[in-house]
Amino acid sequence: MLVLVTLIFSFSANIAYADSESDCTGSEPVDAFQAFSEGKEAYVLVRSTDPKARDCLKGEPAGEKQDNTLPVMMTFKNGTDWASTDWTFTLDGAKVTATLGNLTQNREVVYDSQSHHCHVDKVEKEVPDYEMWMLDAGGLEVEVECCRQKLEELASGRNQMYPHLKDC
């Protein structure tokens, strides 16, 4: 009897694992505008390999998309004070060029969950950083877990910051 119960449990666990693996099929093809919920939702940075990640960083559309550009207000905590900056995101498929005055950051959405509740970005620099963004309103637990798994895979053991746990 114990062998039968163990066998059934093992089989059930394997099916659950297989289902969770197939649930992690991201949105294809990856499109940054889709990943940003077509500019209708705010996203918070929940994990990052960048040791200088801003505390409580949130990106929120600050207007309508014009051609391939989207104005985005980035809000963050600077010590105990809140600060905001107005960026322009230029979107090209999965690629995003974020511009603030003379500062430019290039990134690519490398994973986007099916319902766009979370996504993982690769920040292009000599040693790329990876970031996990989630809807400010929250997301489907299974999709958030898929984003977390994708970030773990890409970050391959690098230290991660949790900027949204900083008294936001």
Curated annotation (Swiss-Prot):
InterPro entries: Calycin (IPR012674)
Record: residues binding (12R)-hydroxy-(9Z)-octadecenoate: R54, T85, R107, H119, D121
Residues noted as binding (9Z)-hexadecenoate in the record, renumbered to the chain: R54, T85, W87
Annotated positions binding leukotriene B4: R54, W87, R107, H119, D121
Keyword Lyase recorded: no
Cystine residue pairs: C24-C146, C56-C168, C118-C147
Tissue: Expressed in salivary glands.
Subcellular location, record wording: Secreted
The entry's keywords: Complement system impairing toxin, Disulfide bond, Pharmaceutical, Secreted, Signal, Toxin
One GO CC annotation: extracellular region
Primary localisation category: secreted
Signal peptide (UniProt feature, chain positions): 1-18
MF-aspect GO terms: toxin activity
Keyword Disulfide bond listed: yes
Similarity section: Belongs to the calycin family. Lipocalin subfamily.
Function: Bifunctional protein derived from blood-feeding ticks that specifically prevents complement-mediated C5 activation and acts as a scavenger for inflammatory modulators such as leukotriene B4 (LTB4). C5 and LTB4 binding activities are independent. Inhibits classical and alternative pathways of complement activation by preventing the cleavage of complement C5 by both classical and alternative C5 convertases. Inhibits complement in all species tested (rabbit, rat, guinea pig, mouse, pig, and human).
Quaternary structure (record): Interacts with complement C5.
Protein name (record): Complement inhibitor
